[in-house]
């Protein structure tokens, strides 16, 4: 990410490390929050951190869905957490969450998905600097995947396109993987109060 989550934790007195496998994202985070700690590494590499390092690990927004081998992810996190430590993961109801990006949703407190027969999957934004952004969320439940296709049209006429492949099994499947590895489900937090409908935080604990 760009360092916002680790900065928020730091502001509340929690010292942490931001992990990303993209050097560009690490550099961007350092530009924005130069006093915080970051590590270039892969969550799927068990050697990224030493065993029993952390009291808490967070996996927020759609990070978990970029990870295909979720069993390896949970195994590594189990190793890196201290006994009794917590993992917080952000999951969505894949069939009902709103895939419209926040900047493209004209309804701040009302989900337009509740007032249409067909799920809205397109985002269109024109920024103040003249850049136009389009995105489309394509969902393939038969193989537990989704694709987010993005197009950036800049003021000078240049166009950049990119695709994000997401691996989206059901919440039940993901949580079952975690439980089979040994995590205990401690709490489920509905994110509707912060305008993320059909999205949840799950607090999992490593046994003592």
How should each PLM-predicted stretch be described?
Residues 61, 89-91:
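A cross-domain feature marking catalytic cores of carbohydrate-active enzymes
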Residues 165-208:
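C-terminal lobe and adjacent flexible extensions of AdoMet/dcAdoMet transferase-like proteins
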Residues 71-86:
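A short glycine-rich, Lys/Arg-flanked "PGG" loop and its adjoining helix->strand segment in the class I
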Residues 91-172:
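SAM-dependent methyltransferase
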Residues 2-47:
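Class I SAM-dependent methyltransferase SAM/SAH-binding core
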Residues 55-69:
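A short SAM/SAH-binding and catalytic strip from SAM-dependent methyltransferases
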